[in-house]
Amino acid sequence: MLISHATDVVQQRAYVQESADSIALAAVIGGQRSANALENILQVTITKLVLTENEAVVHVRVGQFTATSVASHGG
């Protein structure tokens, strides 16, 4: 039972981090609208999104799990 729970936790954490990474990439390319569209598709909550000219920083939550990701592009 413990291994099963640990596996579930790892999978949930990975999902949240992958979602944050994907949303950060979408945001740096397509802005707020793209980030929100992916948020809805992935069924996560963006708790913070900071966009600059060349960078997106996103904080995502799913249940008790949170993740942060930064994406940038050379410009």
Where are these regions (language model features)?
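Alpha-helical assembly-interface signal, strongest on the long, hydrophobic N-terminal helix that forms
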Residues: M1-N36
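Short amphipathic secondary-structure patches
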Residues: S22-G75
